[in-house]
Amino acid sequence: ILQDANDVNQRVKLIDILSHDVQRIERLITDYSQILKDEVALSKEKIKKIDLEPIIKSVVDDFNNIHKYKRKIKISYENDKKNKYFINGIENRVEQIIANLLDNAVSFSEDNKEIIVKVSKSKDKQVMVNILDEGIGFKEKDTNKVFKRFYSNRPDKFGQHSGLGLNIVKNLVDLHNATINASNRIDKKGANMEIMFPKV
């Protein structure tokens, strides 16, 4: 293709397109490799009783340090003040779940927006985590298709994506015998990712 392009500007444009395609393929390979590694590693890891709150606070702090000044995106943590939020889980995997969901929320958010991470307990003492953003929300009627491998509903302005991040999250959530649901926010425009961990 480059050989057929005589104009310098056309060559530069083609190189730019090819460069983006290479980056997209690299991300795809990296994400898919992560899935394969996780599927092997998960079978060897042991679940134990852990406190969810400090894990979430740590991830929220890390993301705030990166995005609060860079893009003026504020990430807030809230809870319903029900003391401890214990779950049966693998600490580094729970951290990965929250980080992936926050990364997804940030990538769909414009600058100067807010993302809220809420932790609460249901009446039957399940632990619920909601990650609410102010992005574009979901156009799909079946919102849970976003967890399918290689599925991506990301508009071009938010950059290209492999469509594997939320599938990795779903696999990790399943490992914890938990559930995850995607929906649009009721109070305003944006997405709501809700995880329900079974009571300990």
Task: Tell me the role of every PLM-derived stretch.
Residues 20-25:
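Short alpha-helical segment of the dimerization/phosphotransfer core of two-component systems
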Residues 66-78:
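Short conserved segments within the C-terminal catalytic ATPase subdomain
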Residues 105-106:
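Short helix-loop "hinge" at the ATP-lid/N-box region of the Bergerat-fold HATPase_c
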Residues 46-64:
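A conserved beta-strand-to-alpha-helix junction within the catalytic ATP-binding
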Residues 40-45, 82-89:
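Conserved micro-motifs of the catalytic ATP-binding
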Residues 138-150:
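Short conserved segment of the HATPase_c
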